[in-house]
Amino acid sequence: MSDYPPPNYPPPNHPQYQQQQDETYHVRPDMERQQDFGYYEKPTPSQNFDDSFKVEKPKFNDWPFAIFFWLVVAGFIAVAGITLNALRSTYGFQGGSIYGSGNTFTLNTNTIILFAFIIVMAFILSAAIIVFARLAPKAFIVTGVILNVVLGIGTAIFYFVEKYYSAAIVFLIFALFGAWCYWSSRHRIPLSATILTIVIDVMKMYPSTLIASFIGLIFSAAFSALFSIVIVATYVKYDPNSNNEACSVGGGSCSKGKLIGVLVFVFFAGYYISEVIRNVIHVVIAGIYGTWYYLANSDQGAPKHPALSSLKRALTYCFGSITFGSLIVSLIQLLRQFISILRSNFAADGNGWGVCGMIILDFFVGFIDWLVRYLNKYAYCYVALYGKSYIKSAKDTFDLIRFKGMDALINDMFINTALNLYSLFVAYLVALLAYLYLKFTKPEYNSGGAFYAPVIAFAFLIAGQINRISLTVIESGTATFFVALAKDPEIFQMTNRNRFDDIFRNYPQVLEKITSDH
């Protein structure tokens, strides 16, 4: 650090960045021209994480949402107990393998085995993607885009040949959109590769990032397995078919209304719990990256065990904030599921105008879903580093978007688009596996093809969710790095001069810093 002199800040009203003879560009500290010179959230060097990232007046933020979450978990466990008991009691009727089920009217053990294949395949592909990203960051971005375009078009062609036109059109749209993203953003890939390389280097320095991601992947896969079985068991327990033996098992009688009501709750709880798992991992990894950015090169050194300290904060003071933001996303996901069901019903009735209306509505709700997820990603970085409530973190995020919005969006377009495309890649393969499985095993409940759409859609959803959680380590590292770079770029300039210069060449706005605090 002695080789790099500290930044010599320009006067507050100086309109240009100053450049000395050593070609060092200095950071403007007063981007917003505010008068609150008392601002300083910068962590202080210490061997203790809580002392470095100090929380003033520690308290359990947003605790009512944490209580609500645990009530949802309790409800899910209760439903799981009732439905799994019905599945166990009628196990011989459902069948114990791929073939030989007496249940010919709804999902059975044939589907459970399919979901097991789906989860294992998604798990293996997710682990392989993390290894690839660590070994070749630039190739990770380029290959991710190209591979998804090729696979998407190939899958669409396959479905066209099979005359499964609805799936073919959906996959073709995804493929064409991926091609457009690559073509329009190819000149920005060097900046993305630089940032991704930095994130991967930190992964190498802190193996706890990978350990946290792997543990999250295990938890997500385990919950996905339980979620999948509970969905099947719910159909088994509450389907009102006269041949359903599970109706006589404890837990209430069968009816269409009960089936729909329980499924709505199960899907909501599944979305909610999955989101909380994902965001807890995000907060833990954000704490590790924050430790590296601010304290790795300090005289005192970085705090010990940042992952455990971040996990402790995520599950105590910050847990209510995590469940708050996750609830918003889960409700939006549930609304999108309702829209999808209505669209399917309109299509079955031949109501073209209804289908068009639902497609338009789904587009707007999908945009809101993307926007909330986008804001949550950065808000949770503030939650992780400063222990703030969800609302205060959201306000800080709005300031970040207000002054760095386009920069953050561009940053996300290149790295996170690649991550999302890898998630789509996994989902493509798993959805194709689900289709082929149903086609070749020919379960009786799908003799008319009525279960192709829901099973394939669920396979696509669950595989994408597992993969997104596994890639949280990269997404969280990128978001945390951008937040820290926006608030304190001079630290990175002093401690990582060459990397900072690489970023500056592609992103001169890095010299502007945000000084607001809520």
Swiss-Prot record:
Membrane side Extracellular: residue ranges: 85-111, 161-163, 232-256, 336-351, 439-445
Single GO BP term: transmembrane transport
Keywords noted in UniProt: Cell membrane, Membrane, Transmembrane, Transmembrane helix, Transport
Membrane topology: Multi-pass membrane protein
Subcellular location: Cell membrane
Keyword Plastid tagged: no
Disulfides per UniProt: none
The organism's place on the tree of life at top rank: Eukaryota
Region (Disordered): 1-24
Biased composition (Pro residues): 1-14
Any one GO molecular-function label of the UniProt entry: transmembrane transporter activity
GO terms under cellular component: membrane; plasma membrane
InterPro entries: Choline_transptr-like (IPR007603)
Transmembrane segments: 64-84, 112-132, 140-160, 164-184, 211-231, 257-277, 315-335, 352-372, 418-438, 446-466
Pfam families attached to this UniProt entry: Choline_transpo
Cytoplasmic topological segments: 1-63, 133-139, 185-210, 278-314, 373-417, 467-518
Family according to the record: Belongs to the CTL (choline transporter-like) family.
Biological role: Probably involved in transport through the plasma membrane.
Record PANTHER family: CHOLINE TRANSPORTER-LIKE (SLC FAMILY 44), PROTEIN PNS1
Record's protein name: Protein PNS1
Organism: Candida albicans (strain SC5314 / ATCC MYA-2876)
